């Protein structure tokens, strides 16, 4: 039996790695896109093109080969072009039946911080904030998120008390004709 493959787009946190590897038996691949965001250029014009191309390069996996993707709040740090590029890559590499977990802030932020999320257990996620050179650049409304992940279905969506929308998307399995 093959272990499910999950990609973590955030900075790998030990407890999350242990949770997916030891508790769930998943192969976890950490693709820390926050490092790319931190080292991105300061020139807004070329930033969009650069980030979009980084998204394509970093997620150069075989189409339909990944069981799950942990996005955390990475989309809050991306402009529209880079976010669309990343979402398209995620949809491309996701297996039918595969899932995407993402967090979207429901309010605008101006302070510069990065949030690292750690899975504590099956019921709890812990967050820790750190200073960073980059602030969240975009607030995603529900309609924008639906468009971003066009082709995936929404499995679950919760608005948390801390004004974060937690969403689980699923790639539909192909229907078989009878």
Positions of predicted regions on the chain:
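Residues at alpha-helix caps and immediate loop-helix transition turns in enzyme cores, especially N-
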Residues: 16, 82-83
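Hydrophobic beta-strand segment of the Class I
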Residues: 69-70
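Hydrophobic adenine-recognition pocket in adenosine-nucleotide-binding enzymes
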Residues: 74
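Class I (Rossmann-like) S-adenosyl-L-methionine-dependent methyltransferase catalytic domain
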Residues: 1, 6, 13-58, 99-178
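A short glycine-rich, Lys/Arg-flanked "PGG" loop and its adjoining helix->strand segment in the class I
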Residues: 84-99
């Amino acid at each position: 039996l093959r272990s499910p493959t999950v990609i973590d787009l955030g900075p790998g946190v030990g407890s999350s790695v242990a949770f997916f590897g030891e508790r769930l038996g998943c192969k976890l691949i950490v693709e820390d896109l926050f490092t790319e965001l931190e080292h991105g250029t300061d020139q807004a014009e070329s930033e969009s093109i650069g980030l979009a191309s980084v998204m394509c390069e970093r997620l150069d996996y075989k189409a339909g080969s990944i069981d799950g993707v942990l996005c955390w709040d990475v989309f809050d740090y991306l402009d529209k072009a880079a976010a669309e590029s990343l979402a398209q890559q995620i949809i491309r590499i996701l297996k039918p039946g595969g899932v995407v977990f993402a967090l979207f802030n429901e309010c605008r932020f101006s302070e510069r911080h990065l949030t690292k999320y750690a899975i504590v257990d099956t019921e709890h996620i812990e967050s820790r904030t750190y200073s960073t050179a980059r602030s969240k650049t975009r607030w995603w409304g529900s309609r924008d998120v639906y468009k971003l992940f066009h082709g995936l279905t929404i499995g679950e969506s919760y608005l948390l008390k801390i004004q974060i929308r937690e969403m689980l998307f699923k790639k539909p399995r192909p229907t078989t004709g009878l």
